[in-house]
């Protein structure tokens, strides 16, 4: 049993270590500065109550992006120095964000221990590599992201930090081999356990879904399937789940080897960045080679996001969560007793609202950030939730879950097709169009303007807030842009009063609400590593069955024109077009 000592290292604060909705994200070149990561980790330990650190069990893993291995060694040595009792590390340092949440909630160590929290090393859908992004966030004992009370405290600590604790002579741990290594420090034993990254998560998925039913679908000669991990951590789970457990062909998996630079790509599952999958599903500019699969899906870097595609058909994330909620009780055993409630982020379309009303379910509209859903789930108020940024999940964990969403869709397809496996399969497009026929359609798009000058972005938002004091002026501008648009009846900055803990979250996005249910929403995103990202959300509700089959960009064109004119987007940003359209 190796001995280690503890050193106190003098340090000074770094500017800008304020965690956003998903932790601290910066360029790798920022994180590799001496003391930078250490300051943030010590500030996090100092923000936690003593019982969550001293004698505690912590998970440390991530999506495998560049600098993860070095960060795991640093955090492990700091945990030992701060009195943590054990560290759990996924093999090769890999754990998807949803798997971390599952491990915190479900896993019991060989000595009966349970994790009280986790450092997750990810920048989610942001690129990886020496010149790209790195990130770190802390998750609590419920498996969810640290609430604002903790993240604010972490930030305050980063502004005053004078020293951090580290065990410099603790040997680097071999994260490639499963097993336990024991050490002894000034406060007693310290153990590091490297464990199988996938087994706990797979066990949880098998308790939620009818794997046999999905297996029948995936092994049917009439059904074809394609899953793209975009070289993110989902690759560590894809073969084990889709091939070994569910019988899919191995060649149905693409880009499923995790890479520290995500193969040089952008691990963001959308129509812009998941190019290979989009082409294979018949949604690219040229005709695909070979037969187009019935079902396709993609994940982001840390596997908490998902994109669902049918044959030549894109399912919007807003529709996806509504369709899962509408079919969950019948198609997914975990929900057979009924849903406790549903929730969506404010910018997500109101498709879920209509389902909730139809099924008489509790409904909540929350700010962007999964922690708000977590509060509702912990209080037993929410079963299924989602956000327009390709995040979908349920109360099985406290993070969004990309593979869970794919299994939910496969469950719905299996349920709808169960008596027709030998004849005509129900397609993804069939399910979506039937949903629109029942509930109406929410035409929806999102324009992202990335790496905009931060000052210009703030000026644009201030302009939009000022306009809200005069709705007649707003309507005059909109009518000047397009006569085919309804009247704005309300404008505000979204504010959320949490029904569970009473906390108030202000300035969560600028909203313009129209008489016919249409919405324009403008937000500054906190997930980028530099510059500002302006997100513009455009939504129009259509109940007329004769009008629900239009192309989305055609149906929304008048509202898009109105939004660009109202915001003076080009004037403020110098951009004549968005970086990404979803």
From Swiss-Prot:
<feature type="binding site">
    <location>
        <position position="368"/>
    </location>
    <ligand>
        <name>alpha-D-glucose 1,6-bisphosphate</name>
    </ligand>
</feature>
<feature type="modified residue" description="Phosphoserine">
    <location>
        <position position="124"/>
    </location>
</feature>
<dbReference type="Pfam" id="PF02879">
    <property type="entry name" value="PGM_PMM_II"/>
</dbReference>
<keyword id="KW-0313">Glucose metabolism</keyword>
<dbReference type="InterPro" id="IPR005845">
    <property type="entry name" value="A-D-PHexomutase_a/b/a-II"/>
</dbReference>
<keyword id="KW-0597">Phosphoprotein</keyword>
<keyword id="KW-0119">Carbohydrate metabolism</keyword>
<dbReference type="GO" id="GO:0006006">
    <property type="term" value="P:glucose metabolic process"/>
</dbReference>
<dbReference type="InterPro" id="IPR045244">
    <property type="entry name" value="PGM"/>
</dbReference>
<feature type="binding site">
    <location>
        <position position="300"/>
    </location>
    <ligand>
        <name>Mg(2+)</name>
    </ligand>
</feature>
<comment type="subunit">
    <text>Monomer.</text>
</comment>
<feature type="binding site">
    <location>
        <position position="389"/>
    </location>
    <ligand>
        <name>alpha-D-glucose 1,6-bisphosphate</name>
    </ligand>
</feature>
<dbReference type="InterPro" id="IPR005844">
    <property type="entry name" value="A-D-PHexomutase_a/b/a-I"/>
</dbReference>
<keyword id="KW-0963">Cytoplasm</keyword>
<dbReference type="Pfam" id="PF02880">
    <property type="entry name" value="PGM_PMM_III"/>
</dbReference>
<feature type="binding site">
    <location>
        <position position="304"/>
    </location>
    <ligand>
        <name>Mg(2+)</name>
    </ligand>
</feature>
<comment type="similarity">
    <text>Belongs to the phosphohexose mutase family.</text>
</comment>
<protein>
    <recommendedName>
        <fullName>Phosphoglucomutase, cytoplasmic</fullName>
        <ecNumber>5.4.2.2</ecNumber>
    </recommendedName>
</protein>
<feature type="active site" description="Phosphoserine intermediate">
    <location>
        <position position="124"/>
    </location>
</feature>
<dbReference type="GO" id="GO:0000287">
    <property type="term" value="F:magnesium ion binding"/>
</dbReference>
<keyword id="KW-0413">Isomerase</keyword>
<feature type="binding site">
    <location>
        <position position="124"/>
    </location>
    <ligand>
        <name>alpha-D-glucose 1,6-bisphosphate</name>
    </ligand>
</feature>
<dbReference type="InterPro" id="IPR016055">
    <property type="entry name" value="A-D-PHexomutase_a/b/a-I/II/III"/>
</dbReference>
<dbReference type="GO" id="GO:0005829">
    <property type="term" value="C:cytosol"/>
</dbReference>
<feature type="binding site">
    <location>
        <position position="25"/>
    </location>
    <ligand>
        <name>alpha-D-glucose 1,6-bisphosphate</name>
    </ligand>
</feature>
<dbReference type="Pfam" id="PF02878">
    <property type="entry name" value="PGM_PMM_I"/>
</dbReference>
<feature type="binding site">
    <location>
        <position position="400"/>
    </location>
    <ligand>
        <name>alpha-D-glucose 1,6-bisphosphate</name>
    </ligand>
</feature>
<dbReference type="InterPro" id="IPR036900">
    <property type="entry name" value="A-D-PHexomutase_C_sf"/>
</dbReference>
<feature type="binding site" description="via phosphate group">
    <location>
        <position position="124"/>
    </location>
    <ligand>
        <name>Mg(2+)</name>
    </ligand>
</feature>
<dbReference type="InterPro" id="IPR005846">
    <property type="entry name" value="A-D-PHexomutase_a/b/a-III"/>
</dbReference>
<keyword id="KW-0479">Metal-binding</keyword>
<feature type="binding site">
    <location>
        <position position="304"/>
    </location>
    <ligand>
        <name>alpha-D-glucose 1,6-bisphosphate</name>
    </ligand>
</feature>
<dbReference type="Pfam" id="PF24947">
    <property type="entry name" value="PGM1_C_vert_fung"/>
</dbReference>
<feature type="binding site">
    <location>
        <position position="305"/>
    </location>
    <ligand>
        <name>alpha-D-glucose 1,6-bisphosphate</name>
    </ligand>
</feature>
<keyword id="KW-0460">Magnesium</keyword>
<feature type="binding site">
    <location>
        <position position="302"/>
    </location>
    <ligand>
        <name>Mg(2+)</name>
    </ligand>
</feature>
<feature type="binding site">
    <location>
        <position position="387"/>
    </location>
    <ligand>
        <name>alpha-D-glucose 1,6-bisphosphate</name>
    </ligand>
</feature>
<dbReference type="InterPro" id="IPR016066">
    <property type="entry name" value="A-D-PHexomutase_CS"/>
</dbReference>
<comment type="function">
    <text>Catalyzes the reversible isomerization of alpha-D-glucose 1-phosphate to alpha-D-glucose 6-phosphate. The mechanism proceeds via the intermediate compound alpha-D-glucose 1,6-bisphosphate. This enzyme participates in both the breakdown and synthesis of glucose.</text>
</comment>
<dbReference type="GO" id="GO:0004614">
    <property type="term" value="F:phosphoglucomutase activity"/>
</dbReference>
<dbReference type="InterPro" id="IPR005841">
    <property type="entry name" value="Alpha-D-phosphohexomutase_SF"/>
</dbReference>
